[in-house]
């Protein structure tokens, strides 16, 4: 799959989680920060990145750079996703279900941020297993990567979309 050029898109970013870690040294503790950041254009492109640095702003900046390198294209049908799917990352599992227009984004913090940045307006989600923000974010991205529209499936099978829907 070709890498998506972030410079061509109008991306906005959102910090999902900031974590402080401590390294104990002879003179006390050394603190370091990690930031989990999501970037997206609300038109079907989204990416998640992790940045680590001694200061929070630097960690966020690195997270944004990393997220721009990991952009994916999300197939959106009307305002929702094409079909139900489960994404897994580590012990984190997330169930994504298409929803009727007007439902809104029913999701927890990390999953909600990613779906809103991707441009999904109506969706039902359920966190299964671990709810660690890192695993939830990566499980959501894995699920979104695996989505296929009827047209994509038809093309892969060499059939028309009508034949696929008919069964």
From Swiss-Prot:
Domain of life: Bacteria
Keyword field: Ribonucleoprotein, Ribosomal protein, RNA-binding, rRNA-binding
Signal peptide range in chain numbering: none
Subunit details: Part of the 30S ribosomal subunit. Contacts proteins S4 and S8.
Domain S5 DRBM: 11-74
Domains: entry comment: The N-terminal domain interacts with the head of the 30S subunit; the C-terminal domain interacts with the body and contacts protein S4. The interaction surface between S4 and S5 is involved in control of translational fidelity.
UniProt name for this protein: Small ribosomal subunit protein uS5
Described function: With S4 and S12 plays an important role in translational accuracy.
Annotated Pfam families: Ribosomal_S5, Ribosomal_S5_C
InterPro entries named among the record's database cross-references: Ribosomal_Su5_D2-typ_SF (IPR020568), Ribosomal_uS5 (IPR000851), Ribosomal_uS5_bac-type (IPR005712), Ribosomal_uS5_C (IPR005324), Ribosomal_uS5_N (IPR013810), Ribosomal_uS5_N_CS (IPR018192), Ribsml_uS5_D2-typ_fold_subgr (IPR014721)
Family, similarity comment: Belongs to the universal ribosomal protein uS5 family.
A molecular function GO annotation: structural constituent of ribosome
Record's GO cellular component terms: small ribosomal subunit
Gene that produces this protein: rpsE
Ribosomal protein in keyword set: yes
Entry's Gene Ontology BP terms: translation
């Amino acid at each position: 799959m070709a890498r998506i050029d972030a410079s061509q898109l109008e991306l906005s970013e959102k910090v999902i989680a900031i974590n402080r870690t401590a390294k104990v040294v002879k003179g006390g503790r050394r603190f370091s920060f990690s930031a989990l950041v999501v970037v997206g254009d609300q038109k079907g492109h989204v990416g998640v990145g992790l940045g680590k640095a001694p200061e929070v702003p630097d960690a966020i900046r690195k997270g944004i750079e990393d997220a721009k390198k990991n952009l994916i294209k999300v197939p959106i049908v009307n305002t929702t996703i094409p079909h139900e799917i489960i994404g897994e990352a580590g012990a984190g599992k997330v169930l994504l279900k298409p929803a009727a227009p007007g439902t809104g984004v029913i999701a927890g913090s990390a999953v909600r941020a990613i779906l809103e940045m991707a441009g999904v307006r109506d969706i039902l989600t359920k966190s299964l297993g671990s709810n660690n923000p890192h695993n939830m974010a990566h499980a959501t991205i894995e699920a979104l990567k695996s989505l296929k529209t009827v047209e994509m499936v038809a093309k892969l099978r060499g059939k028309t979309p009508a034949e696929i829907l008919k069964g």
